[in-house]
Amino acid sequence: MKKKNEILSVTFARRIALMTVCMIGVAGTMQAQQPEKVGGKNRTQWGVKAALNIASLDFDASNGKSESTKSVLGGAVGLTFAYAFNSNWRINSGLEMSMKGFSADETGGSRELTVHAAYIQAPVTCGYVINLGKWNFEPRLGAFFAYGVAGNYSLSGADSKQTFSDKLLNPFDAGLAFGLYADNGKIVFGIGGEFGLAEANGKKFSVSGGTVHTRNTFLSVGYLF
């Protein structure tokens, strides 16, 4: 089983890398073949972002019931990229460092488990731009791909341990990403969520009778160059 999980993880990582390379190649090809501007604005836009994360885990039991852990506050910073197909449709991506986690009471005990996890993350979403005067409003829907690189966890009164190297959480995560954004051509505000679809718990996080997935709600602000 261990070898099988390692093979699946490597395969998943390769698919993420291949998809990223393909996206860069397609965007580069499209940029070379089409005019640089759409509606008087640059077809390609780069930017930076910062976000407040409200993260948790969701447990989907085999009996159909769903329970969530307590939330923890985190954050995200990164680079953003947008490519406009026309004046309405565009694809959004980027690369960011995102801090997530959760807090939960120990089963059958009085201690509390607190987990912090840092991911390198690449969201890929498609958006439809609605122009209202000086502001653009853009609902987005797509996916996110993440790999855990750092973090720690601890039970009340105990020493902290490493979240991923100690295999509390699975470092690979991916799922649905969605949000509503507003920009004036330079400043971007956003609110949205992420629903992880990959199995989140590692070998030292035993869960019976269901599956565990990451959840995150975020508020973001960005600047477009």
Per-region residue spans from a language model:
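Gram-negative (and chloroplast) outer-membrane scaffold detector with strong preference
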Residues: G40-Q45, L52-D58, A82-Y153, N216-F225
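Residues that define the transmembrane beta-barrel architecture of outer-membrane proteins
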Residues: N42-T44, T69-G75, H116-A122, W135, ...
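Extracellular loop and loop/strand-boundary signature of outer-membrane beta-barrel proteins
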Residues: S62-E67, T107-T114, K161-D166, K203-G209
